[in-house]
A protein has these predicted regions:
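C-terminal/domain-edge helix-coil "capping" segments
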Residues: 22-25, 105-107, 111-150, 250, ...
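Amphipathic beta-strand/beta-sheet edge segments enriched in Tyr/Trp
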Residues: 80, 91, 98-102, 209-283, ...
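Short beta-strand->alpha-helix linker/helix-N-cap micro-motif
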Residues: 146-215, 225-238, 253-257, 294-298
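Conserved structural position within tetratricopeptide repeats
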Residues: 34-37, 67-71, 104-105, 332-333
């Protein structure tokens, strides 16, 4: 089983891109340092110096300058963006998330905001990996604090059988069980992504699934009181058997009688429903009528669509986001009403795009924008006194109308505007009156 730590690879891409992105000369940095020392209260001076340090791969100094700028103006979108890039370069995942989210609030360059939104998908994966590492580092401490018996982790099932095309059911079947268990208000089900990150970290994935009595370490690290695991067996070409067990993490004992059933392959969803209802009994959960009815919902009526979906989950776990999105898309083609596959496809596409985001690609999208002018100023050793706070839609439209204001963002051509690079009469995409309206109210006071 290949385990591709996509977010680690993506982080390396971001870090490597720093070395090939726009650089700032030592002379320019010295000039900016003098300007900052002369006006330590200037947010613009701190912002420009921080960007220059970042471009020179002097990340600790960049962080300090950008933090000072952010304290002076928390609404400065450019500062938020470069704080996020700096945090990623320093492997500060939480800091990167906070800064990127601030950029989504206050940034004005639409293309870059789209990139950062996609990048946050990768940041979320990195957060799960970080949490897994921290949990393992604190394992002895966590072992002394038992998880709540109402917190349940559903681990991948183990498939055995001749038809390897059914192997992705290890993930798909486990997700069905987790989804149905989460329909009870009495239980808290651990997110699948957290579980997978931990399994990767402690190499439980080597055995793929988790049978009764095993995986207790994973449950302890997840602070789950109980874990659910089991097997799916292909008895012949058309019959499946599922066995599932509830294990108490603290005592390592199996609770209840276990759940098992056997059905024809095309009755996979009936098989899962029978299993999960028995698991509720073993978990000591009495369902309400509404909860019982919701469990009867089926994600799809197409077995082929669900197999494609399960394969997508497998590929997603391996960090193969493009391939995963194709599998999810195949599931949607087989069943256009398969909403879970639609959502997973969107998520996989965002993750694939986010993994490709780099410092170079971000700065390329800044070229020719108002925000890009501040980057150009740092590159050339000049300080722009203009505030770079969030200007919202108005600034985004203005950037499209006359991008020459910031035409030197990455070209080194300066930041002083000359002639517009775009005929204002050509439109900007922001002049569609059906979607963007400006209201001017004139109040005249009578004498």
């Amino acid at each position: 089983m290949r385990i591709a730590h996509a977010s680690v690879l993506a982080g390396l891409l971001m870090a490597n891109a720093c070395a090939v992105a726009i650089s700032t000369s030592a002379d320019n940095i010295s000039r900016l340092e003098r300007a900052s020392a002369a006006k330590p209260e200037s947010e613009a001076a701190q912002r420009t110096l921080g960007i220059a340090y970042f471009q020179a791969n002097r990340f600790a100094e960049a962080r300090a300058a950008l933090d000072r700028a952010a304290a002076m103006d928390p609404r400065d979108g450019v500062v938020a963006l470069y704080r996020g890039l700096t945090a990623e370069a320093e492997n500060d995942v939480l800091g990167a998330r906070s800064a990127y989210e601030a950029y989504l609030l206050y940034g004005t360059t639409r293309d870059v905001k789209a990139q950062i939104a996609e990048r946050l998908v990768i940041i979320a994966r990195k957060e799960n990996e970080l949490a897994a590492k921290e949990a393992i580092a604190r394992e002895q401490q966590l072992a002394r604090v038992p998880g709540s018996p109402r917190t349940v982790a559903v681990l991948p099932f183990k498939f055995t059988g001749r038809d390897t095309s059914l192997a992705p059911l290890e993930r798909g079947f486990a997700e069905l069980v987790a989804t149905d268990l989460s329909r009870s208000a009495q239980l808290t089900v651990v997110e699948r992504e957290r579980i997978q990150a931990l399994l990767d970290e402690i190499t439980l994935q080597q055995t793929v699934g988790v049978e009764a009595g095993t995986g207790v370490r994973a449950g302890r690290l997840l602070q789950a009181g109980r874990i659910v695991g089991g097997t799916i067996s292909q008895l012949d070409s058309n019959q499946l058997r599922a066995d599932a067990f509830v294990t108490n993490v603290q005592t390592t004992a199996t609770e209840g009688r276990g759940a098992n059933d056997q059905e024809a392959l095309d009755q996979l969803f009936t098989l899962e429903k029978n299993i999960v209802l028995r698991l509720f009994t073993d978990l000591g959960v009495v369902l309400t009528t509404a909860e019982r009815n919701s469990i009867e919902q089926r994600p799809t009526r197409s077995l082929a669509a669900f197999l494609a979906y399960s394969r997508g989950l497998e590929l997603q776990d391996e960090g193969l986001f493009d391939a995963a999105s194709r599998s999810f898309d195949a599931a949607v083609r087989l069943d256009p009403t398969f909403s879970a596959a639609q959502q997973r496809s969107r998520d996989a596409k965002s993750a694939a795009a986010g993994a490709r985001v780099s410092v170079r690609s971000v700065q390329s999208r800044l070229r020719g924008t108002r925000e890009g002018a501040f980057v150009a100023a740092a590159t050339q050793g000049g300080v722009s006194a203009t505030n770079a706070g969030g200007g919202g839609e108005a600034f985004a439209i203005a950037d499209g109308l006359n991008p020459s204001v910031a035409g030197g963002a990455t070209s080194g051509s300066g930041v002083t505007p000359t002639q517009p690079q775009k005929d204002p009469s050509a439109g900007t995409g922001g002049d569609n009156v059906s979607t963007k309206t400006v209201t001017v109210t004139v109040v005249i006071h009578h004498p």
